């Protein structure tokens, strides 16, 4: 009984904190999904869920992800105006920059990665040029 109450409280708090997405966040998600669509044509499946937020100049968004050896991943990011250029990088749990295939065109960027070890990795989204903007990260795998 007690754990059910705590679970209900935790769900209420997380739902309240999440709140509805702004129009800008929805536009960033659309841009990320448009980019990720190119990878679904190559057999990649979209992972459920996404991450949205605001990124400012000289600040980074760091998102932890669990990846499995033997899979291939594409991390796709879309941003809204006034972002002019964004980048995506992948780091292992020790902070080592991983070698990735990369794509970047203005307010959209992607990084392709195939881990040799399963575990936690970090995706770093960086606003290279422009002012504070909404961004969205989605990823796909095969």
Whereabouts are the PLM-identified features?
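Short amphipathic alpha-helical segments, especially helix-boundary/capping motifs
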Residues: 12, 26, 37-39, 48-51, ...
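Generic detector of short alpha-helix boundary/capping microenvironments
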Residues: 6-7, 31, 46, 63, ...
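Acidic, Ser/Thr/Pro-rich low-complexity intrinsically disordered segments
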Residues: 20-21, 49-134, 140-142
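Predominantly extracellular/luminal regions of secreted and cell-surface proteins
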Residues: 19-44
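Positively charged n-region of N-terminal signal peptides that target proteins for export
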Residues: 1-5
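Hydrophobic h-region of N-terminal signal peptides that target proteins for export
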Residues: 9-18
């Amino acid at each position: 009984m007690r754990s059910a109450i705590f679970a209900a409280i935790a769900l209420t708090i997380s739902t309240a904190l999440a709140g509805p997405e702004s129009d800008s966040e929805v536009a960033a998600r659309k841009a990320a999904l448009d980019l990720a669509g190119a990878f679904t044509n190559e057999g990649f499946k979209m992972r459920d869920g996404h991450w949205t937020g605001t990124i400012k100049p000289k600040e980074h968004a760091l998102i932890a992800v669990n990846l499995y050896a033997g899979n291939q991943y594409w991390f796709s990011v879309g941003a809204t105006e006034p972002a002019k250029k964004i980048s995506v990088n992948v780091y292992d749990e020790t902070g080592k920059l991983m070698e990735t295939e990369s794509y970047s065109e203005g307010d959209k960027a992607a990084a392709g990665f195939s881990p040799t070890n399963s575990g936690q990795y970090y995706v770093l989204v960086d606003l290279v040029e422009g002012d504070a903007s909404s961004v969205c990260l989605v990823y796909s795998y095969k």
